[in-house]
Amino acid sequence: MKEPIEFKLSGDRAFSEREKAINQLYNRRYFGEVVNGKLFLSLIEAAYLMERGKIKVLDGGKELSFEELFELGRKKDDQFDIKYLVYKDLRDRGYIVKSALKFGSHFRVYRRGMDEHSQWLIWVVPENLRFSANDITARVRVAHGVRKNMVMAVVDEDNDVVYYKIEWVKF
């Protein structure tokens, strides 16, 4: 088994300056974002890669366990659990998953590479969430404006994910 790539915790992200990290994780598999020669991962990306034994994350020199990293994610985001489930499901299906905060959603999703524009915006919601029609309308309007499909990822109490595509219908 290959040695996990070392990352360091920095706020709500983990980073590595190692060229191996950039080549293996960003250039080949589209994880994270490269800024000034460093590969930055969100906590969700870091947890996903850590769970698979691809990386290890250090906080002040101490190696974190998967559970410790996950707990940090929970402290920073009360929906970390369900977002992670959706992220993991999409990545395991072979999709490329990136943040979509600037689009008012949780994730943007690419088919199998990032040569083209992303096709979907994913809004992650727990099964019992109450929301208004305006919540949906606003998200669909943004998705339509940037030529993407709006998908609601509903996570039930058994941690199963069901995807619903939401679109405008013109009569």
From Swiss-Prot:
UniProt name for this protein: tRNA-splicing endonuclease
Keyword hit for tRNA processing: yes
Catalytic reaction(s) noted: pretRNA = a 3'-half-tRNA molecule with a 5'-OH end + a 5'-half-tRNA molecule with a 2',3'-cyclic phosphate end + an intron with a 2',3'-cyclic phosphate and a 5'-hydroxyl terminus
GO molecular function, one term: tRNA-intron endonuclease activity
GO CC annotation: cytoplasm
Family: Belongs to the tRNA-intron endonuclease family. Archaeal short subfamily.
Documented EC number(s): 4.6.1.16
The protein's assembly and partners: Homotetramer; although the tetramer contains four active sites, only two participate in the cleavage. Therefore, it should be considered as a dimer of dimers.
Lineage of origin: Archaea, Methanobacteriati, Methanobacteriota, Thermococci, Thermococcales
Top-level division of the source organism's lineage: Archaea
Leading EC class: lyase
An individual GO BP term: tRNA splicing, via endonucleolytic cleavage and ligation
InterPro entries linked: tRNA_endonuc-like_dom_sf, tRNA_intron_Endo_cat-like_sf, tRNA_intron_Endonuc_cat-like, tRNA_intron_Endonuc_N, tRNA_intron_Endonuc_N_sf, tRNA_splic, tRNA_splic_arch_short
